Amino acid sequence: MSMRSELPKQDEIIFKLNEIVEHELAGVVRYTHYSFMIFGYNRIPVVSWFRSAATETLGHATQAGEMITMLGGHPSLGIGKLLETHKHDMAEILNESMEFEIQGVELYRELLTLAEESGSITLEEYSRRLIAEEELCVCTKEKAL
């Protein structure tokens, strides 16, 4: 089956992918902001780590947008919720970013359920790969705390 052929639950899948695009784009802003707010002896490696996370997150948004267009949909120009707590302690930043990654896992799990219901192996594998990546990000942040 071609990805542009009508899939069961296609509209729901495109909607969920757009939620993912918006979530990931908010992550780009979040991680870039965090990189600005790091001070102290560990600044150089931590700034690089957050900027790398921003780049990875932009890649996730791009992949979701490509999936949307492969399905004949239109990617959102929106951006997800941006939370500014004004807490820039490293532990607070790690906790906030871990919560962000957990939300990402939930979105990709919801997409996986829709993909399984639609019978699209491509979407299933995409969802599983991103769930694994996001879960590894959560584990990395848990280890840092």
What does each model-identified segment do?
Residues M1-L145:
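Iron-associated oxidoreductase/ferritin-like identity signal
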